[in-house]
Amino acid sequence: YMQYDAENNNYSCTSVIFKSWKDDPIDSKGGVRCGKVIGKDKNQLSKAELDNQRDTKCYRLIYGLLSMDCTTADGQPTSIEDVPILWRVTGTNFKPVGESLKSLKSRGNLMQNHFLNLTSNRRKSGDTVWYVSKIAIDNKTVKFTKKDLETMDLFTDLITDENKRVSDAYHKANDKKETDKITAKVIDNLEDDPATILAS
């Protein structure tokens, strides 16, 4: 999960990278899912709260190697091969990617042993244009090499580092919340009867 702050043009909150929906995606602000409300709980929200929810999205993260024919900024044809990438998908691209990975798993195949051939379909609504991924799985099995293992280890290290960063921020935010509660309690007591507090 990531929460976008349009005013500052950055992500103000991120959750840990999790593998299962059963995991608890703690976030950098000391909460869960960057405040995203899911399921039936959405019915309890006001319109303003629902509008705020649009800034928080769940992303599917795909780590892999990219090979493609492409064009440079000045229009020259070129190509790249086996470049390590992180592909972040959400919205209309979330489901197609998930379905492709699920179909591999249901056949007993591992993602790292197959090429995923990507194209996109252009969509337009009014002035808004976006692209939806179209994924075709190459049924040919690709050999998993020592170099691939090194790249996978690199991805694992990146995930571990990111999750540690978010976890540290989560605990720090919760420690601050606890300190703020204690401070608020002391202030409340002072407001109730300062003479009693100062005499003790």
Sequence positions of predicted segments:
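Extended serine/threonine-enriched, polar tracts that run as long, contiguous segments within proteins
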Residues: 57-141
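Glycine- and charge-rich intrinsically disordered segments
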Residues: 146-200
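Intrinsic disorder/low-structure terminal segments
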Residues: 3, 10, 17-20, 93, ...
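Low-complexity, intrinsically disordered regions enriched in charged/polar residues
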Residues: 11, 39, 83, 91-98, ...
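Detector for Asparagine
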Residues: 8-10, 43, 52, 93, ...
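OB-fold ssDNA-binding interfaces and closely related basic DNA-contact patches used
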Residues: 1-79, 125, 176, 181-183, ...
